[in-house]
Amino acid sequence: MAKDIKFSSDARAAMVRGVDTLADTVKVTLGPKGRNVVLEKAFGSPLITNDGVTIAKEIELEDHFENMGAKLVSEVASKTNDIAGDGTTTATVLTQAIVREGLKNVTAGANPIGIRRGIEAAVAAAVEELKVIAQPVANKEAIAQVAAVSSRSEKVGEYISEAMERVGNDGVITIEESRGMETELEVVEGMQFDRGYLSQYMVTDNEKMVADLENPYILVTDKKISNIQDILPLLEEVLKTSRPLLIIADDVAGEALPTLVLNKIRGTFNVVAVKAPGFGDRRKAMLEDIAVLTGATVITEDLGLELKDATMESLGQASKVTVDKDSTVIVEGAGSAEAIANRVNLIKSQLETTTSEFDREKLQERLAKLSGGVAVIKVGAATETALKEMKLRIEDALNATRAAVEEGIVAGGGTALVNVIAKVAELDLEGDDATGRNIVLRALEEPVRQIAYNAGYEGSVIIDKLKNSPVGTGFNAANGEWVDMVESGIIDPVKVTRSALQNAASVASLILTTEAVVADKPEQKAPAAPATDPGMMGY
């Protein structure tokens, strides 16, 4: 296919038009008085949202060169969302500001490479100062404030803070659609995996069809149990203790399953068998997780162990296990705190190195199950459109809250970015490097300017007053008052603010240093054939 090529100022100008189109669409959502954007969907009702990355992903421009600019900004939003989970609109606004100011200087003859060096130095200084002024998130109230600011709902803030308190900061918190109108929180304590009993005759409660095992022993193996003789000595030892037994194995089949069921029905022995969760290497890892949590040893050939080698010391323990037809929940495993902590650290290190989104999700699930449990926020709303919008807001709030716990918080509403301006201005740079620094100084004001504009105020007036106010004092655009932002609960996670600035500067620098852009030439459509006269065809 033939290519269309633009050079230097023409190339940059075309891309900047795309940047402006996308940024102008996204930035109307910024701040407490931000508006919504309605997105047409191919099927079903339109989506109404104020989520920056969701809007950015939907924008596709007809002009190829403009579309490249728009896609680069969309990448900024996506990258910020991946790293911090929020701050996508701020990142978009910062990108537009850096590109706009940078383009003026490049057009006037400044060297783009020098400008990029200055931008990088200024951003590094700003990030360091953000870390200096950051405050740790120390309690449940602070967590609730972060979530409430991000979701624009105090109720959502309470749900998220309670969920994190119940399942821990590393715990899994999932967001599902509720069947009712109300949003509610449900917490599953302990480790849960999606495998149920192998026979319904193993239940202890015939009405609820669940098996409740109090203070059970737990056998963990990746082997298939088909011959009862393999585990008979172990069963006899467990029988002497009068305690129930949970068997987690690759499968229990052949004569072994009916023998276990028969003993259960006769009341000789309370035993429940379930299949091991996961598949392949992931199954081995999950079995090891269960073993660490319960203090068991996995009976596996990898350790040179056979089923006949299993002893009472090989078994794990827990205060309670509940098994239904689809899932198993292990509560308060008897594994040592040190072993669990080491396992958690191992999974965290794997999380840092993995590049697969699927692997990352599964590792986070394993981490949460070891850390204490799973919380589910069930989102309810009057209509499907409202439900989708609410779900997106809660996802943003959850991500922002995790980021706040990780790196701390700063004054929200763009205030922290203005607070670091003085430190960035101290950078001793010359020539085009100094120009790059000045571009960042101007861009750092832009989020506050846009928040003020969306709320109906003059941004320049707000900026001037903010620069002369104590650090942490800012403008509450929701009611027009000047307040201590942190005390008033208007806060942003450092990770969100930092990621937005770093990603914006990175992509903006790429656009400013672009000298040629290559795009596919649009195909010329052939003219439609003229209609044929039926009389000419013998009719």
UniProtKB/Swiss-Prot annotation:
Places the protein is found: Cytoplasm
UniProt EC number: 5.6.1.7
Keywords recorded for this protein, A-Z: ATP-binding, Chaperone, Cytoplasm, Isomerase, Nucleotide-binding
Keyword Cytoplasm: yes
Any Gene Ontology biological process: protein refolding
Pfam families: Cpn60_TCP1
NCBIfam families: GroEL (TIGR02348), PRK00013.1 (NF000592), PRK12849.1 (NF009487), PRK12850.1 (NF009488), PRK12851.1 (NF009489)
Coiled-coil region(s): none
Residues at which ATP binds: 29-32, 86-90, 413, 476-478, 492
Binding partners and assembly: Forms a cylinder of 14 subunits composed of two heptameric rings stacked back-to-back. Interacts with the co-chaperonin GroES.
GO terms, molecular function: ATP binding; ATP-dependent protein folding chaperone; isomerase activity; unfolded protein binding
Cellular component aspect of the GO annotation: cytoplasm
UniProt similarity note: Belongs to the chaperonin (HSP60) family.
PROSITE patterns, per the entry: CHAPERONINS_CPN60 (PS00296)
Catalytic activity from the UniProt record: ATP + H2O + a folded polypeptide = ADP + phosphate + an unfolded polypeptide
Signal peptide: none
Protein name as catalogued: Chaperonin GroEL
Cited SUPFAM superfamilies: GroEL apical domain-like (SSF52029), GroEL equatorial domain-like (SSF48592), GroEL-intermediate domain like (SSF54849)
Gene that this polypeptide is encoded by: groEL
Described purpose of this protein according to its UniProt entry: Together with its co-chaperonin GroES, plays an essential role in assisting protein folding. The GroEL-GroES system forms a nano-cage that allows encapsulation of the non-native substrate proteins and provides a physical environment optimized to promote and accelerate protein folding.
